[in-house]
Amino acid sequence: MAEAATGFLEQLKSCIVWSWTYLWTVWFFIVLFLVYILRVPLKINDNLSTVSMFLNTLTPKFYVALTGTSSLISGLILIFEWWYFRKYGTSFIEQVSVSHLRPLLGGVDNNSSNNSNSSNGDSDSNRQSVSECKVWRNPLNLFRGAEYNRYTWVTGREPLTYYDMNLSAQDHQTFFTCDSDHLRPADAIMQKAWRERNPQARISAAHEALEINEIRSRVEVPLIASSTIWEIKLLPKCATAYILLAEEEATTIAEAEKLFKQALKAGDGCYRRSQQLQHHGSQYEAQHRRDTNVLVYIKRRLAMCARRLGRTREAVKMMRDLMKEFPLLSMFNIHENLLEALLELQAYADVQAVLAKYDDISLPKSATICYTAALLKARAVSDKFSPEAASRRGLSTAEMNAVEAIHRAVEFNPHVPKYLLEMKSLILPPEHILKRGDSEAIAYAFFHLAHWKRVEGALNLLHCTWEGTFRMIPYPLEKGHLFYPYPICTETADRELLPSFHEVSVYPKKELPFFILFTAGLCSFTAMLALLTHQFPELMGVFAKAMIDIFCSAEFRHWNCKSIFMRVEDELEIPPAPQSQHFQN
């Protein structure tokens, strides 16, 4: 019974919806019928005669003024549309049409079923889009005190944004703190230091934490009833305090390396103690996880110090040992540091071995992986590559593989080639990057430009082939070729990560909507007609009459511009030009 009632209600609802769909036609005919019935009381014929008389008495100046007013309004609309597009990246009228007019016309109802049906199929791509818009820690980030601050002293510009430094503060609190820090005075001070915005306050807090560790605890041990002896015991050092001083206070890489070595001694001792106690409870497990992060960070930065100071082989050994000791800590992306160091040594076979392990479909990609793979394939053919010869004989198999690798890399991050080809100036890379964005391109090119220059002909091959990628993906925001569609969020995130004096690279280039171009053309054409009509009213009237006659004629397709001007000359009765005196007898 209930099912029958439900079915009846559904049928009644569908009938009402159907009736409202076609009810407007009934109302239209009713209005026409009322107008016809009331034509005499409303004096419709008299009103129409008055309107026609008014239109006949209008002078051409009125139409010129009307045209000029419409041109002015069109110009104001154009200026507003251009401002709205520059600020928000979309057309105001198109947005209003899609957001407000389309639901009124039933567009949302038609698409809602399709969206609900395809929601499960698009869930993977949505998750991928969110992951691609995630901000990552730059594995090759510079030292604040020894590199970023020196740049500020020389140029007076701040290379890091507040948003970037705030993300670093959050990373430090995640990696270097735990819930049991309040039990140790030095760690409690450092927990507050990582939250400080003022660099001097952070440095002062780090020194305070080290001074607390220098306090010696004295324990009385009675040896004889009449005498005592004082046993001196040192508290463990605070490794995170040394990390902060090495990152922000040290003005050279050598000073930073000394502080990191002191941090390594303290961090290694804390790591060994917490490793023995990690199974005694969740508190000890969290402390061991924190000590592991501290130790890995210190060793990685020591390897980067060795790389900066020219001890590249030592840096490679330290990175390999670190990856063997902690294979599961992929959050630091140490393999990207290793790839850069191996390229500096020109150990291309080792680079290929690392790529074979990390250039996997199940692992997240990066510009370092994609462009390093392209560099290795370009290295095999770049020294003999010639675009003229390739156009004559075609590409060989090796050249085709190199071109495909370049296209793959450019599709992943299309901003990198402009920096490698020095079409855009480089700046210091930020501490955080957005994969496939301009920030990642800067971070990659800053360290790898020298490696591309070292391979003969590699930049030439890149210059000849990188733009061909865009022909394969004409709509990169909707569909990709080898990767997911290019994320829309990169421009906004890069503007937050990169300093204001840098011009952020935007992909794909935003083109003006058709409505803005159409409005601009219509406004210009109308204004030109108004000006010509005001200056030459008789000529424009004759020209308009000739155009109307031509458009109304059945032989319009046989007319051309010459025929139009001949018709205008006939209307104006322009006499023929006098014959030149040189041809008179």
Curated annotation (Swiss-Prot):
Q: What transmembrane ranges does the database entry give?
A: 15-35, 62-82, 512-532
The alphabetical list of record keywords is:
Glycoprotein, Membrane, Phosphoprotein, Transmembrane, Transmembrane helix
Please list the residues that carry the modification Phosphoserine: 386
What is the annotated localization of this protein?
Membrane
Q: How does it sit in the membrane?
A: Multi-pass membrane protein
Q: Which residues are glycosylated?
A: 47
Q: Which Pfam families match?
A: ST7
Family assignment from sequence similarity: Belongs to the ST7 family.
Q: What is this protein called?
A: Suppressor of tumorigenicity 7 protein
Protein's gene:
ST7
